[in-house]
Amino acid sequence: MARNEFVFLIDVDNTLIDNDRVAVDLKRHLTQEVGGRRQRRYWELFEELRQQLGYADYLGALQRYRVENPRDSHVLTVSSFLINYPFANRLFPGSLDAIEHVRQWGPAVILSDGDAVFQPRKIERSGLFEAVEGNILIYIHKEEELADVQRRYPAKHYVLVDDKPRILDAIKRVWGPRVTTVFPRQGHYALDPVAVAKYPPADVTIARIGDLVAHDAKTLKAAARPTRG
């Protein structure tokens, strides 16, 4: 496989899609369907599962809720709400423009963590699948799969866009100056000063994903710092 000059690896949740808004909508729907107490129990199960898996699994948490409440007919309604959610309405402003912009210099690839059902559904319904021409990678722990990323999308230089400082730092430690890390300050991870302070700053920080259009490949590559830690 020919090696690209650049490959742009872009996260989904709170990078391209406002997942915090999705969670707010789900909480509201759960409260309407099952009441406040059971809504809170769903999120307890959700957090337990996230700790176990390392990623958010909305349908998995709903299945656990169903085991605890086998005769709750509202489970099907909540499942339908998730599967048919209008994710395209939750794209951050400028998300698709940012993808189109970077594709001038190389493939744009979705690099995400998640389950094997809901995450692909989210990517498809949001229009992101089409925007990146089907270049989708979904892992359990993406920072542990860099060899596979390189095999599938070989490049002289990578640009990684992610709202989680932990992920940016972990991948920077492996790839060093071969990757430019870009930190869009969107979502609860990016806006948590304690969480952000735990890690070195990204090579490039932008206020929102749409601001990526102000950067070209040459300047992004020049911004890459050496390996940290």
Language-model features and meaning:
Residues 1-44, 67-68:
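Active-site neighborhood of HAD-like aspartate-dependent phosphohydrolases
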Residues 1-5, 124-160, 164-229:
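Asp-based, Mg2+/Mn2+-dependent phosphohydrolase catalytic module
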Residues 11-12, 111, 161, 184:
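Short hydrophobic segments within beta-strands
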Residues 15, 22, 116-117, 166, ...:
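Conserved Rossmann-like nucleotide-cofactor binding loop
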Residues 16, 108, 160:
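Conserved SAM-binding loop
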Residues 22, 33-37, 46-83, 101:
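A metal-dependent, Asp-based hydrolase signature
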Residues 59-60, 64, 80-110, 143-148:
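Short, acidic loop-to-helix structural element flanking the phosphoryl-transfer center
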Residues 96-109, 113-137:
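Substrate-recognition/cap helix-loop segment adjacent to the acidic, metal-dependent catalytic center
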